[in-house]
Structures are given as structure tokens and as C-alpha cells.
Amino acid sequence: MKEPKVSVGVMFEPKIEFILNSGFICNGAEYSGLQSVKLSGGKIEWLGKVFDELIFEPADGSISSFELKDVTIGINFHWERKENQLFKGSLKFIVEGEKITAINLLGVEEYLTSVISSEMSATASLELLKAHAVISRSWLLAQIDKNIEITNSSEKYSTMTESEGELIRWYDREDHTRFDICADDHCQRYQGITRASTPIVMDAIGQTRGELLMSEGKICDARYSKSCGGVFEEFQYCWEDKKYPYLVKQRDSKSDTIIPDLTVEKNAVEWIKESPESFCNTTDNKVLSQVLNNYDQETVNFYRWSVKYSQKELSQLILKRSGTDYGDILDLVPIERGTSGRLVKLKIVGTKRTRIIGKELEIRRTLSESHLYSSAFYVEKEMGSEQAPIAFTLKGAGWGHGVGLCQIGAAVMGEKGYNYKEILLHYFIGATINKMY
């Protein structure tokens, strides 16, 4: 197996300005300097001519780089912002809908250098970085394989089922059909060479080059999130109804504590009310700074957290985020939970409409201006004099979907002296680590 290439969708705008910092070849000629493309009649206009697609290949791959202006990062998150970003590799433009998509084409190991630098802090330990290199590489190649399977299948792939009384939707990278993955948190945070990689990141990638998590002869769909909240979630409760043997419930701890059945409502509420010992139950800034970039460090309480809305605030928020008018919200009723206590289905009861929504990210998107920290929460209602709720408090656990590697837990394990293989096999139960190229 040779090192694969990857195509990354970086930005989506009707007009894109970019700088070729050295020579790039396009349509047989060499170009450099400031350029711009814009949408024109469903095609790409550049230098007064229109094209279905454009590709700029570096004249010298060792030194060539390009800069994209005003790339949006943190799309739909509370810290969404624009920044100029620098990339190596090739640059391709295509048209999708009413926008031009800028795509970066490059080798997997070069891509990983950016992902690890973007996802992790430069202060992270070598073992944590090595573990992250293996899961990021595995996740990426598993997604490419999955996309090929979906493309070759005669069955229509859908991430949503909807009826009058229920909307079940999950969010995965299958939204992307003309490139492998996107550059935002929807896939993996990728910012080219904008943030200089450190020697330790290069070392972690070099030491694990070509290593993949494998299970039953296939590359593992190696998911990760910030904090599992003490128990791992299972894949099928967050995405399609598919059970993977290596993504199963387990305590984020080496203790022998028995996990209560958190799919049972009473147990889930009691679990969230507690703050049990776990690898990811930490307030150690030295550890947290290894995982959280500056804008993530704005989040202080993540292992156990609380959010409060007045009835009016919640009603307006749900209308704005879902586009569905439930009227005044009367109740939020848990219908189904996963193995970590995360809600898979939630019933929204309003004066105009009642509906069940899921899965976990749909719930998180509907109940927050950006994303709730997780769907592992229970609801406390404050009742008014007319027996109508005047406020709702959501009390929750963890940060993210909780499937696979828990980044904060893994950082703590690294600090405690576990090596990267021990960290990986704690989170991906029964998997193996194989060098494939």
C-alpha cells in the first residue's frame, strides 16, 4: 500500500481570492501572485474566461504554497471566525450549488501534520500526539473507503428519516461527494500550514507513519471527541444503526467500577448528577492546554455542566434553530438514551406542536445557539403560578458525542505514563494497530 492522497474541501464562497506564493501550473502555463475566481452563470470565472473546474499544480512541491483569503473556521460554533490560511499541495476549484468550492489535494501524512497541529496544542505529550496521529489517519482512510462503498452501492444512502411526529437526523461526512472530507470540525479541523507544526508533531507522525487501527480486516472508523463524560458512547446511537465491536460502552477509567445501565432514565439522571472518577474528570490546566486551543479553553465546565433558559428564550431558540414552530415550549421529554446516557431521541412538547427529534447532534443543535456540549443531560423545570413552565435548566455530562477516543481522557493517560498503544486500545476495544505503508 502506497501513501494515499486526500482531497479536502476548505471553503465555499461565490468569490474566492487567493495568492500563489510561488509558481503554480494551470492549463499548461505558470502563474503566481494574487488571483481571484468568482461564480458566473454556474461556472468559474478567472482572468475573464469561464471554466467548469480549475486546478493549480505546484511547479515545485517542496517550496510551493498558496494562501486562501477569509476562510471561515468553526462553522456554526460560538467561536466562528474568518482567517487567511496557507496550504501546500495542489489547489482545485469546482462549482457546487451557488458557490465555488476550494479543494486542497495533498498526501495523507502532510495532511495529518496540519490536523494534529490544528486539533491539538503544541504542548501535548508525544504519546498523546502519536495516538492522535493513528486515529486521525485511520478515520480519514476509513471514510474514503466508506465513500467508495456508498458510491458503489445500489442502495440510496440517507442520513435522515422524517415523519409528522418524528425527525431523526445524523451528521456525518457523507455530505461530501466531490471531495473526501472538509476542513472544519464537521470532519477534522484542518488549517493547512497556517499554524506552524512543531518538531514533536512531526516526530509523532513520523514514528507512527502508515499505522492504522484495524478490526476484522477493515480500517477502524476511529471517532474522537473532547470528553466522554466518564463512559464511552456506542456508534449506532450517534450515526447510522451500525454496531462496531471496537466502539462499545466502557468506563473511561481503569477502576473496576460497574457501569449502571445508562439507557435507563433513572440511572442516567443519577449518573449525570454525580461526578465520578474518570480519566477525563480533570481541571488540570497543564493537561487541558494539551487538547484545547485558545478558543476551546473558553469552555471551563465540560465534565459536568448546566445551561438555563427561560421559557420564552427556549421557545424562540428552538424556532430559530429548527425552523419548526412548536409554540410555547411546555416540556422536553427523554425518549431514548445511549450507553453513555446521551439522549438519542427527545420529545419537544409545545402549545402548537409535539415532535420527537434525534440523534444526538440534532438535539444539541436545536437546543443551543451553536451546539450544546453534549446530549447527555436531564431537564429540571421551574413551574409558574399557572402550572406552566417559566424556566428550563439542562444539566449535562461531557463534551461531544463521546464515541471512540476521549481527547481529555487520553491527555490524562499520557500524563500518567501510558504509551500511545495502551491509550488507543483503551478506547478502541479489541482493535489492533497495523503498519500498512
Predicted stretch roles:
Residues M1-Y437:
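Conserved, single-site charged/polar hotspot
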